[in-house]
UniProtKB/Swiss-Prot annotation:
The gene is eIF3l. Belongs to the eIF-3 subunit L family. This is Eukaryotic translation initiation factor 3 subunit L. Keywords: Cytoplasm, Initiation factor, Protein biosynthesis. GO terms for biological process: formation of cytoplasmic translation initiation complex; translational initiation. It comes from Drosophila melanogaster.
Length: 539
């Protein structure tokens, strides 16, 4: 194991007088000193990694990033940090760009692996390292000639937003901090990881890449290179711009601003595949936050479509990410959250979904919980929401003189209250729906007596309010076409419709029967394709 104890032992041999005053000799001395302390495979990995990034060798960079780095982390640094900057600098000739990228991985590893999480100083240093990276690529007069794999660019932006979220939660947890720590956080470090910094960086990446103009050009059938500009023509800037749009979606969702969350994605046709959606984790994260935003905006039909489409995608593409265990765990967790959210949406807005998704809901016993929710069990709604929602944050830190308390849960409890208020308005609607489905005509007084055998005239008046609520809640804004996910037309999503003439309810069943033909056609085509592949195999 390569850790702090080994450092302490080796440091006994450090000789201050070995420095000669000659910069070249001193650098050589430091290189040999730090290299002697590192395991050989770590040292050679860092040297080769630096060389691959210098040469822009994408294949080698991706292999070392996706495979070698996690393997060495597991073997040498499972619960400890990687070597610090000065140690690595000595063996990579102080390569500025590589050291910034290395520190991004270094602090990411600390957030993910070190028990107890990063210290305040490490959080602040990570923020300034991100600033160095973004200043390097945004403030340059000409595009920086840097090639990184798309998966690294996505995870870099995603980690940047995650560390903002993590710092906001750390900042809000006052009960675990001394008065000096609170003072230091609120006064000395009030600007680090601030929401304005995060939004500024993400919007700057979007602007410099001209990604919105490029996406609009693609939707109009125009060559995006004509509007990309000097920076946006490079894949490095273009993909950073695209991933920053998804980062903005996540940030606004964490703040509870669902309208703006969907708004920032306007150039992206959410419900269509694109050339930019080749990173599974990015596509899944996008759909999770879009679907959640739709649910909170009471656009249940769009939320159901978003969740169903991405869950089908996950079912069909598991082999793409199953080789990376940490990514597999993350995607499986997000998929589980989306099944919970889909179950909520189907209770509030029943409609037909793909049979394979229904099968998963049955196998995982979601139907029992869905039945309880249909019967008005608010605790099940609450537990499903708490499990599946994002970990919301407040854009502002607690006041310096705030009582010593844990403020982490405040944003989530506020969003939970908003959601539960909506659920309470709808909790009686499934009962009303179940009675209406049994009849084509039904007197108001008879329906009132079904709901309450001792119904009075006042109860009949209240029933009219409930029926009006049913009409209102079942009428949703539904996206049909166009680049804006906010647009749509009002449609009734209920399986039945009705109108009231005098004291008589006239009911029409609008339920669309299952289209089993499509299911069998897909299976036949899949079987034929498999049969062709088997015939082409040479044994």
């Amino acid at each position: 194991m390569y850790g702090g104890d080994e450092y302490a032992t080796n440091s006994d041999y450090y000789d201050d007088y070995a420095h000669t005053g000659d910069p070249q000799l001193d650098m050589e001395y430091e290189r040999n000193y730090y290299a002697a302390r590192m395991p050989d495979n770590v040292k050679y990995f860092l040297i080769n990694f630096c060389q691959a990034i210098k040469e822009g060798n994408l294949y080698d960079i991706q292999n070392m990033y996706e495979n070698t780095f996690p393997q060495i982390s597991d073997h040498h640094f499972d619960k400890t940090a990687w070597p610090e900057e000065q140690e690595v600098a000595a063996i990579v000739d102080n390569d500025k760009v590589f050291l910034i990228l290395y520190k991004e991985l270094y602090y990411r590893h600390i957030h993910a692996r070190i028990p107890g999480g990063p210290k305040l100083e490490q959080r602040i240093n990570s923020f300034f390292n991100y600033c160095d990276f973004f200043n390097l690529i945004i403030s340059a007069q000409n595009p920086v000639m840097l090639e990184l794999p798309d998966i690294w660019l996505w995870e870099l932006v995603d980690e940047f937003v995650y560390q903002f979220q993590n710092f906001a939660q750390y900042r809000a947890r006052l009960t675990e901090k001394s008065q000096d720590e609170i003072q230091q956080l609120c006064v000395n470090h009030s600007n680090e990881w601030s929401i304005l910094c995060i939004l500024n960086v993400l919007h700057s990446l979007v602007d410099i890449s001209n990604i919105k103009k490029q996406l609009e050009a693609i939707s109009q059938g125009v060559d995006p290179q004509t509007v990309a500009g000097d920076f946006g023509k490079l894949s490095f800037y273009k993909m950073l711009g695209y991933f920053s749009l998804v980062g903005l979606l996540r940030v606004h969702s964490l703040l509870g601003d669902y309208y703006q969350a969907i708004k920032v994605l306007e150039p992206i046709e959410i419900h269509k595949k694109s050339a930019y959606s080749h990173i599974p984790a990015c596509q899944i994260s996008t759909s999770y936050y879009v679907g959640f935003a739709y649910m909170m905006m009471r656009r249940y039909a769009d939320a159901i479509r978003t969740f169903s489409d991405i869950l089908l995608y996950i079912q069909r593409t598991k082999q793409l990410y199953s080789t990376r265990s940490y990514q597999n765990d993350q995607i499986n967790k997000q998929a589980e959250q989306m099944y919970h959210l889909l179950a909520i949406c189907l209770v509030l807005h029943p409609q037909c979904i793909d049979e394979s998704i229904q099968q998963v809901l049955r196998e995982k016993n979601y139907h029992d919980a869905m039945f309880k929710m249909q019967c008005g069990d608010l605790e099940v709604f609450k537990s499903f929401f708490v499990f599946a929602c994002p970990r919301f944050v407040s854009p502002c830190p607690p006041a310096v003189d705030a009582p010593m308390d844990d403020y982490v849960k405040d944003p989530m409890e506020h969003q939970l209250q908003v959601f539960m208020d909506e659920v309470r308005q709808q909790k009686d609607l499934p009962t009303t729906r179940s009675y209406l489905k049994l009849y084509t005509t039904l007197p108001l007084t008879k329906l009132a007596s079904f709901i309450d055998p001792n119904a009075s005239e006042d109860d009949v008046s209240k029933l009219l309010i409930r029926l009006l609520c049913f009409k209102h809640k079942m009428r949703n804004l539904v996206w049909s076409k166009g680049p804006s996910g906010l647009e749509g037309t009002f449609k009734s999503g209920s399986e039945l419709d009705f109108y009231i003439d005098d004291d008589m309810i006239h009911i029409a069943d609008t339920k669309v029967s299952h289209r089993y033909g499509d299911f069998f056609v897909r299976k036949i085509l899949k079987f034929n394709d498999l049969n062709r592949k088997l015939k082409n195999i040479n044994i």
